[in-house]
UniProtKB/Swiss-Prot annotation:
This is Homoserine kinase. One of its GO terms (cellular component) is cytoplasm. Pathway: Amino-acid biosynthesis; L-threonine biosynthesis; L-threonine from L-aspartate: step 4/5. The lineage of its organism: Bacteria, Bacillati, Bacillota, Bacilli, Lactobacillales. It is found in: Cytoplasm. GO terms for molecular function: ATP binding; homoserine kinase activity. Keywords: Amino-acid biosynthesis, ATP-binding, Cytoplasm, Kinase, Nucleotide-binding, Threonine biosynthesis, Transferase. It comes from the Bacteria. Belongs to the GHMP kinase family. Homoserine kinase subfamily.
Length: 289
């Protein structure tokens, strides 16, 4: 069997740690024959373990410690430490591996509870499990999630040629906001979510770019962000935002305007790459060999 988990783009502006969307890049785990010891075959990086030290197996064995070892093949086009949920995809894959081999019959909500407990927040793991757009919260161990269709639009990801670790991106955030700042920031988030659910991408785009929770503190960590935002705005994009903690920059635009936006961005002296993406509507799934 093969376990497939989509990449995810979290926050979407003001939906800090609570809103995310699944997109069309994938982690795939092919489950092969039983053996005496675990082996993960991959070419993702020399520093990524091939045995039980791999996060995938740490998660699976944390849930079902006595799983029969197997040979696994891991492939992924989800870039590491780029703000597209690479670690979350591995967490969700590990849960699904335990679910399948341990015959746990976990519901999606049970998977979300486990994944959120491990990850600490649901913004990436929720869409990785459910697909589509997910608005979720985790308060004192209680996780709630609403799944919805993302409005019709094109996604364009600018993926830089450098990493930005989440812990580094979080280190520039303020320790706290004043009550007035919190009210303003949450009201913008409310409008962004409501507009997305209503299919109003113009209003959603304005609210997404009006984020007060994190982007203004993080934007200088992604040197291309300001220029990309300027170019995309001049050419009619709905919104441009930092995907997750960055450094990937996500552009949302109508189908007719995106080719123009992409062409203009390709003229810029950036060293990263542009990727056309779509919304993944399935989330984690298992395919028979």
């Amino acid at each position: 069997m093969k376990i497939i988990v989509p990449a995810t783009s979290a926050n979407i502006g003001p939906g800090f740690d609570s809103v995310g969307v699944a997109v069309t890049k994938y982690l795939q785990i092919e489950v092969c024959e039983e053996r005496d010891e675990w082996l993960i075959e991959h070419q993702i990086g020399k520093w990524i373990p091939h045995d039980e030290r791999n996060l995938l197996l740490k998660i699976a064995l944390q849930i079902v410690p006595d799983l029969q070892p197997r040979r696994l093949k891991m492939t992924s086009d989800v870039p590491l430490a780029r703000g597209l949920g690479s670690s979350s995809s591995v967490i969700v894959a590990g849960i699904e591996l335990a679910n399948q081999l341990g015959q746990l019959n976990l519901s999606d909500h049970e998977k979300l509870q486990l994944a959120t407990k491990i990850e600490g927040h649901p913004d990436n793991v929720a869409p990785a499990i459910y697909g589509n757009l997910v608005i979720a919260s985790s308060v004192e161990g209680q996780v709630s999630a609403i799944v919805a269709d993302f409005p019709e639009c094109d996604f364009l990801a600018y993926i830089p040629n450098y990493e930005l670790r989440t812990r580094d991106s979080r280190s520039v955030l303020p320790k706290k906001l004043s009550y007035k700042e919190a009210v303003a920031a949450s009201s913008i988030a409310n409008v962004a979510v409501a507009a997305l659910l209503a299919g109003d991408m113009v209003t959603a785009g304005q609210a997404i770019e009006g984020d007060l929770f994190h982007e203004r503190y993080r934007q200088d960590l992604v040197r291309e962000f300001a220029m990309i935002k300027q170019v995309t705005k001049e050419n009619g994009a709905y919104a441009t935002y930092l995907s997750g903690a960055g450094p990937t920059v996500m552009v949302l635009a109508s189908h007719d305007k995106m080719p123009i936006i992409k062409a203009e961005l390709e003229k810029q002296p950036f060293k990263g790459k542009l990727h056309d993406l779509r919304v993944d509507t399935q989330g984690v799934r298992v395919e028979a060999k």
